[in-house]
Regions:
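Amphipathic, interaction-prone secondary-structure segments
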Residues: 6-29
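Mixed-charge, Lys/Arg-enriched low-complexity segments
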Residues: 34-83
Length: 83
């Protein structure tokens, strides 16, 4: 999907108010979260390269949040390829 902010997918399909935007830059895939209920997140948090997501995964082991679901590399690549 695409809107004025760019390409996106729903990282939590049951919640259409949260979107994960994706782009390719400098040979890496970058992610940026947008939440309709917390619009300040868009301004406060910039684009995150996938490499940084992978490095941070260990901090979330055993916790409620799963970065692997939210930051879906395969889905991001498919969206970018479709574009």
């Amino acid at each position: 999907m695409k809107d004025q902010r760019g390409l996106y997918y729903f990282p939590f399909p049951q919640n259409k108010r949260i979107r994960m935007y994706v782009r390719e830059k400098d040979g890496d895939i970058w992610f940026r979260l947008w939440n309709a209920d917390e619009p300040r997140l868009w301004d406060e948090h910039g684009w995150v390269p996938y490499g940084a997501v992978k490095r941070a995964e260990s901090m979330y082991q055993g916790k409620k949040f799963d970065p692997g679901q939210a930051y879906d590399l395969q889905l991001a690549l498919a969206l970018i390829e479709e574009e």
